[in-house]
Amino acid sequence: MKAKFAKVVAVIAAIGLAFGASAAPARAAGSTINLYISADTNIQDLWQKTLIPEFNKVNPNYNIVVTFDRNGANDAQTLAKIIASRDTRRNPGIDLIDGGMVTTLGAAGLLYRFNTVAIPNLKDVPKVLIENGKGGIPYRASQVLLAYNSTNVKTPPKTLTALLAWIKANPGKFTYNAPAGGGSGYSFVQTVLDSQLTAAEIKTLATTEDKTIQAKWSKGWEILRGLNKFTYGQNGTYPVNNAATLDLLSKGLVDVAPVWSDQIASAVKAGTMPKNIKTISISGPSFTGGPAYLGILANGTNRPGARVLINWLLSPAGQNLIVAGSMNGLPVIPVSKLDPVAAAGIADLDITTMRPPYVSANANNVRSGWATEVPGK
């Protein structure tokens, strides 16, 4: 195991340690790439157990140093430090970011502006995904789905309205995790909030912080508070994260819950989720999903190395690992370019139609707002 991960240096530490104290000279290509991951542990595992070892097999001269921030708990602090490093012309201690803040960084002009000359494999990525990234580079995708126990739920709800009615008709059999703890619960909360907004307002919140529109979340908070006595526990308490939601499903303690497509597929493959747990998409509106973005910091010290890593990730070899490995993710290049075995079951995939989550600033306010407006109310 040590040999397998010889090139991986995992730094799970206070966020402040992720930033250098002074400016440093640019590193030569083929040295250290500082990767900051703001996500759940399955993304951490994807990088450290699959992507980095495989990348190092063909690029042995790179040492990838990982800093992990679970579920973006320190996104606001990290963003502030990046801005400060730019303003003071100091080394941010980060070259590449995988996390929800990437589009915010891009909109603020803090990301390296890439092109297909620097990253040739971008030519295979749909232009709409690149444009939506605001300077971020899409490298994988996933979708929040509604998981249900097919033994107990013969006709699962297919719309948000039907789901809300089902929850009230089946007390204690539905749950979702706290939005700050994971994206599946966050997606459910955003979807309820969006159900009370116009299409134009939803589109705005996906790209721009808007306090006026946020004020209209009040109707959504009211709906969510009204579910407290009907969700698992029936006292306004919720699972702490994505994994806790999956655990309740696997043990049969709940029959219905929102889950990440990649996480539920991984659990079924690993045998930790019963095969009678199925998934379905809902509409009116749908749960959120779409690509995850990588951002190359404009003032990072190893932009060339970050470009090499991203170009490899966008190759068929890199995308096959995302689709067929433990991640069970969705590709951002045409399925026709993937290994046929890896692509089995996703031939009709169109990730360009997935509904995106809010931009980071709005998403953070969803998380904090839910914590004060919903639990125990």
Which residue ranges define each predicted feature?
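Mature extracytoplasmic/periplasmic domains
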Residues: 287-288, 292-354
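Periplasmic-binding protein-like
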Residues: 141-144, 224-227, 274-295
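Early extracytoplasmic/lumenal segment of secretory-pathway proteins
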Residues: 29-100
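Extracellular/periplasmic bilobal clamshell ligand-binding domains
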Residues: 339-377
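C-terminal segment of classical bacterial N-terminal signal peptides
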Residues: 17-26
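Short helices/loops that flank or line small-molecule/ion binding pockets
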Residues: 76-92, 104-108, 243-253
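Extracytoplasmic ligand-binding site segments that recognize negatively charged/polar headgroups
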Residues: 38, 42-48, 69, 73, ...
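A ligand-binding cleft/hinge motif common to bilobed small-molecule-binding domains
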Residues: 103-106, 256-275
